[in-house]
Amino acid sequence: MNFIDKAISMMSPGWAVSRLRSRAVIKAYEAAIPTRTHKIKRENRNANQLNQISGKSLREQARWFDNNHDLVVGALDKMEERVIGAKGIIVEPQPLTVAGTLNNVLAEQIRARWAEWSVSPDVTGQYTRPVLERLLLRTWLRDGEVFSQMVAGKMPGLEPVAGVPFWLEAMEPDYVPMEKTDSTNNLIQGIYFNDWQRPKSYIVCKSWPGFATAMVATKLIDAENMLHLKFTRRLNQARGVTLLAPVIIRLLDLKEYEDSERLAARISAAFAMFIRRSDAMVQDGDAPDYADKDRDLDIEPGTILKDLLPGEDIGTIKSDRPNANLESFRMGQLRAVAAGVRGSFSSIARNYDGTYSAQRQELVEAQEGYAILQDNFIAAVSRPVYRRWLATAITAGVIDVPPDTDMATLFNAVYSGPVMPWIDPLKEANAWRILIRGGAATESDWVRARGGAPAEVKRRRKAEIDENRKLGLVFDTDPAHDPGEQDNAGSEDNSGGDKNAAGDDSRERTRGGRQ
């Protein structure tokens, strides 16, 4: 307190306290001060406490949406297409020789064996690698996390795939019980951690736990053999949370609102009318008796109603359905949903209205979000699986490593997935040509931008050109027989002067005529 506050506190302590309180309020942020119109909502629990309470409920709600909500199904399908794609994560081996050049012999050997193993990589033998990766991604985004055990060596009931004794055992998050927590042993939600919060081992149920987790036998799997892909928004979070958590309420409200509008439209579509009578007919004691008379009227196109009595007319029920504002309201809600799930509005809503520039701008912005999810998947699944598979294949003698290989680069590889689609292929292709000619990109980058593997494309391209030359076939797709670009450029240069001269002559004639 300053001198004035001390003096006031001696005479009126309550006044001094009020002054200090007011000074503290002035220094604080406005958002930190609760008011009648601003109700403060706080979250002071750590990530594990929050997930322990609501994680399972959110996961079950997200699964219900994936089964019953068309918008969620479409959004997750689009995530599969944009993050994993039809061919899965493409792995291009990049081992180098001691001279620093690419070891093409070893790379081709690894690539061939990897393709054979990718036909049936899981323990069930039901999925190819791209299908398994898409299921892992969908489980990760919907449930918040997914587990997969890497099984290597001789195992009863399992046959080596392409000569490599290595498999994947994918598991939903229910197999790692979240109820298993013991602070004395540093066990948090089914995962043992060391003092640095690095996972040591996982408690895994041997069968589907269902509702009776305590009755199911469990096993302990070392962390080095377990892949754990989780979606987190906070540090030091042991288990993942579904991607749909921030938008669950909005999605449920939108579904119920659409159901109500659809039901109202069905009711209004049922044509209804009524017979209106005048008051004079009702009050007249001689009015006809309608009790025994059939008043059902058969109506069809061109019908002339002759059964109406004097003083009666036909009235119809007016309907305001379907709601004219439903489309705009729905689109606004879908924009909010797309922002909450790191997706593209046009892809989720299937609304592709707009100019080329607007569509491409949205693709550019949305692609970064897909790239982040893709990078997380590669870091947690694709890279560990490839490196463990390669080590197992070398140990099993399936792959021979040449003596001139730089062993420090043995596990090097380029991982790539789906890239941003091309709205106008001609514009995109011309842009890539300019980048390559300017030295800002490579031909491999161009091939990857189309979702292909550079080595595979070059191999097939060379075989195609060699076969055409062998058969004496000439197409303009062979650059050796397409000097048209230089001819066009030369003709433009040669004709430029004539065109300019012709233009000058025409302008001179125009000026002469005007004079």
Language-model segment annotations:
Residues 66-94, 132-140, 244-264, 377, ...:
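Short, Φ-rich (hydrophobic/aromatic) sequence segments
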Residues 227-362, 403-405:
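Extended, charged amphipathic alpha-helical segments
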Residues 2-20, 361, 376-515:
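C-terminal anchoring/interaction modules
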Residues 1-97, 508-515:
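N-terminal-proximal low-complexity accessory segments that begin disordered
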Residues 101-108, 305-423, 455:
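Surface-exposed loop-to-helix/strand elements on domain peripheries
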Residues 73-232, 435:
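Structured, mid-chain assembly/scaffold modules that mediate subunit interfaces
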Residues 108-119, 135-142, 146-149, 153, ...:
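A broad, structural surface signal
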Residues 127-129, 151-152, 264-270, 348-352, ...:
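Short coil/turn segments at secondary-structure boundaries
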